[in-house]
From Swiss-Prot:
Organism: Bacillus subtilis (strain 168)
Source species, domain of life: Bacteria
The encoding gene: ykzE
Region feature Disordered, mapped onto this chain: 1-20, 38-58
Name assigned to this protein: Uncharacterized protein YkzE
Amino acid sequence: MKKNRHSRDMQNHKKPMNKKVLEEEFSSELGDYNAGKIIETLEVTKPEKKKEKNKKQQ
């Protein structure tokens, strides 16, 4: 019996999204004029979180 290979397929399943499309989509759902800025804020803070994790491990 052959094993399923779902994990390899899932790596190719995730597609990069356009920032502008995400901003338009989520800003209308949240109902706030500057809600699209949340995405920019998250992208700015991601590298900082990675640095913090590396410092904690050392």
